[in-house]
Swiss-Prot record:
This is Protein GrpE. GO terms for molecular function: adenyl-nucleotide exchange factor activity; protein homodimerization activity; protein-folding chaperone binding; unfolded protein binding. Homodimer. One of its GO terms (cellular component) is cytosol. It comes from Stenotrophomonas maltophilia (strain K279a). The gene is grpE. Keywords: Chaperone, Cytoplasm, Stress response. InterPro entries: GrpE, GrpE_coiled_coil, GrpE_head. Belongs to the GrpE family.
């Protein structure tokens, strides 16, 4: 009977070792699963944050350019007021002064909403902001510089709304 005792103990030890190994394997599997869940949660949090930033940026862009159509529709009005002031000359007349004040107020309101006037006389030609309609030899002007502006251009929050129509000094 003594001989059977060590067999039972060795079987019990083997069973305990197998059970311990099984538990250790299960613990490792659960740890790996926890790490995977943590990584997935972190990825989801990052995706959510990126989406929040994207939506905020889209809202900001929509706010920035909400006035684009209105201000674009006002450009011919600016042109007409400017032409009227040039036609009136420099004579001090109440109608001319009223027209000039109206034009300045309108330009200020537009500027407060992100509109920037492009009046590039003397500046180098910039194809991103200017549309050349001709080149003329101009003594005293740097080649490639704007010498005449036929129609002023405008930027809205640094984005071109209308290019300036210009004449450029020939090389």
């Amino acid at each position: 009977m003594n001989h059977e005792q060590p067999d039972i103990e060795s079987q019990q030890s083997a069973a305990d070792a197998a059970a311990t190994a099984g538990v250790n394997d299960e613990v490792e599997r659960l740890r790996a699963e926890i790490e995977q869940v943590k990584a997935d949660a972190l990825r989801e949090r990052a995706d959510l944050e990126n989406q929040r930033k994207r939506v905020a940026r889209d809202i900001e862009q929509a706010r920035k350019f909400a006035n684009e159509k209105l201000l674009g529709d006002l450009l011919p009005v600016f042109d007409s007021l400017d032409a009227g002031l040039k036609a009136a000359g420099d004579d001090p007349h109440p109608l001319r002064e009223g027209l000039e004040l109206t034009y300045k107020q309108l330009l200020k309101v537009a500027a407060d909403n992100g509109l920037v006037l492009l009046d590039p006389i003397g500046q180098p030609f910039n194809p991103e902001h200017h549309q050349a309609i001709s080149q003329v030899p101009t003594p005293g002007a740097a080649p490639g510089s704007v010498v005449t502006v036929f129609q002023k251009g405008y930027l809205l929050n640094e984005r071109l709304l209308r290019p300036a129509l210009v004449v450029v000094a020939a090389d």
